[in-house]
């Protein structure tokens, strides 16, 4: 059980989103939310406040009569439930609901506590509104996608429950849950913010961390297979560059390589008198083997930056207007604008694309016998010409990497004015997060094929017993899923199984 106040750590977000930890609201935070609601209730009676007694967006110039104020809140929910495309994965919906709840935990939205309690109920019971992927321009927040969450909260639309897509009203009646009622601005408060892009962003972040970890391990195993000199990962060399990510990757590689009998010591091998005029072993390996700290270092930095920004976003008030009980006022502005998340998702997808490109190049090294000089073509353990080894899986890896490269074009600078130019510059943050999600999924596919290629190479060279304990554990884990193969068999199911292993 996670007790939620107005701040979440990355560990808490992961526990709630990935491990389905239950949620309860901290009592002090509960009191603050109730106090904020009562302040707004009194403050708003004789004032013009956007979205309470005015229309929305460019329609804000029209005042709404008192008898229609409740109807207004339902109208924004129903009118904006217009998404299209496939539904978001339920893990992303769970993360989005948590992000919306956290905005209300800041006690600056003026919502009735019932709104927060119902979001908690949905999270704890695993009720996930059906949210189509497309609809957000990310700049009055995720209006369309969040409207689908609000639609479920008022007992309409559809939800996923126990793996089934069902009518919301039926599920709520079955569980004895009352639909949300509108009090002052609940409709606007639920729909107006960055929760969906932030939720998808966190799911992307967790997977990006895993991919970086797998890439680092695979890179050590790559260098063991190639019997590389180990000085490229030395503390002295990497310490001469001040980038935190580069040094973190180099340190991780040194730890993973500890105990290896395959890596060479340059001083022992080359820094002694030699009469050779031509060297059989490469003095310096290819960049995809030697420059790993410099390539994965920026990926590490991008992941760290995304984590910092996403934590700031989920622990912020991204509503509009903002209710300020302390100063006895209501402030109008643009905290719903998703530029921070949009920019980070663009950076993260570029970083994961580069990681994927590194993976594909490392795999190419293993497949290309004239480059590696130690393995048969395509790591083919069968009869050359009759059997094909990893030749065909490489097509999948190459085409998928190419798609990542195209998807890496930034959304952040693709603003299109809309909403009758009321929203004349927008973030496209949810689109950026969705594209990042696609890149992450692609990267797992390439990584899975690379992992199978790596263990085939280890078996070809018969070096499993000479690997470092960490890379031997990786070898054993992949071999438990994909046994050594010589003859040609369909590999799509094994690739899928390795992907699932990598994700966990």
Where are these regions (language model features)?
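C-terminal auxiliary extensions adjacent to catalytic cores
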Residues: 2-21, 25-32, 36-39, 69, ...
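Glycine-rich, flexible loop motifs
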Residues: 2-46, 71, 76-132, 223, ...
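Hydrophobic alpha-helical context, especially transmembrane and signal-peptide helices
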Residues: 44-48, 126-129, 146, 167, ...
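FAD-binding core of FAD-dependent oxidoreductases
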Residues: 50-64, 68-72, 79-102, 132-154, ...
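Mid-sequence acidic-hydrophobic segments that form the walls
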Residues: 79, 95, 99-103, 118-129, ...
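Well-ordered mid-protein domain cores that form the structural environment of catalytic cofactors
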Residues: 105-128, 135-146, 151, 163-184
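Cysteine-centered functional microenvironments
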Residues: 131-136, 326, 330
């Amino acid at each position: 059980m996670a007790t939620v106040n107005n701040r979440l750590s990355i560990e808490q977000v992961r526990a709630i989103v990935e491990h389905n930890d239950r949620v309860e609201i901290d009592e002090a935070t509960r009191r603050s939310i109730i106090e904020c609601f009562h302040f707004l209730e009194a403050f708003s009676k004789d004032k013009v406040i956007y979205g309470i007694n005015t229309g929305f967006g460019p329609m804000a110039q029209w005042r709404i009569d008192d008898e229609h104020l409740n109807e207004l809140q339902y109208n924004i929910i129903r009118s904006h439930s217009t998404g299209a495309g496939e539904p978001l994965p339920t893990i992303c919906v769970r993360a989005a609901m948590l992000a919306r709840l956290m905005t209300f935990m800041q006690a600056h939205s003026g919502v009735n506590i019932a709104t927060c309690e119902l979001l908690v109920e949905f999270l704890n019971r695993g009720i996930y509104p059906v949210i189509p992927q497309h609809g957000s321009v990310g700049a009055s927040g995720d209006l369309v996608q969040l409207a689908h969450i609000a639609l479920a909260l008022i007992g309409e639309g559809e939800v996923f429950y126990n793996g089934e897509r069902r009518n919301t009203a039926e599920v709520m009646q079955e569980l004895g849950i009352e639909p949300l009622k509108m009090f002052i601005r609940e409709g606007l408060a639920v729909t107006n913010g960055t929760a969906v892009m932030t939720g998808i962003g966190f799911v992307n972040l967790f997977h990006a961390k895993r991919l970086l970890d797998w890439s680092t391990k695979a890179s050590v195993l790559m260098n063991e297979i190639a019997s590389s000199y180990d000085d490229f990962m030395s503390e002295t060399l990497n310490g001469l560059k001040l980038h935190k990510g580069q040094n973190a990757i180099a340190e991780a590689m040194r730890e993973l390589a500890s105990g290896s009998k395959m890596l060479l010591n340059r001083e022992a091998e080359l820094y002694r008198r030699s009469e050779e005029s031509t060297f059989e072993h490469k003095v310096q390996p290819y960049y995809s083997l030697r420059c790993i700290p410099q390539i994965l270092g920026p990926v590490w930095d991008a992941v760290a930056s995304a984590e910092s920004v996403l934590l700031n976003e989920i622990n912020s008030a991204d509503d509009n207007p903002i209710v300020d009980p302390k100063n006895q006022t209501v402030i109008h502005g643009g905290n719903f604008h998703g530029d921070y998340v949009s920019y980070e998702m663009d950076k993260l997808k570029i970083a994961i694309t580069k990681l994927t490109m590194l993976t594909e190049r490392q795999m190419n090294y293993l497949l290309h016998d004239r480059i590696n000089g130690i393995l048969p073509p395509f790591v083919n353990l069968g009869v050359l010409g009759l059997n094909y080894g990893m030749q065909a899986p490489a097509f999948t890896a190459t085409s998928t990497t190419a798609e990542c490269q195209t998807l890496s074009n930034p959304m952040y600078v693709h603003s299109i004015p809309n909403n009758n130019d009321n929203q004349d510059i927008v973030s496209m943050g949810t689109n950026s997060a969705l594209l990042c999600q696609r890149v992450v999924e692609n990267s797992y596919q390439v990584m899975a094929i690379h992992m199978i290629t790596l263990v085939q190479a280890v078996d070809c060279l018969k070096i499993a017993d000479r690997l470092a304990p960490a890379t031997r554990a990786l070898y054993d884990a992949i071999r438990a899923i994909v046994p050594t193969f010589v003859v040609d068999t369909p590999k799509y199911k094994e690739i899928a199984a390795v992907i699932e292993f990598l994700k966990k």
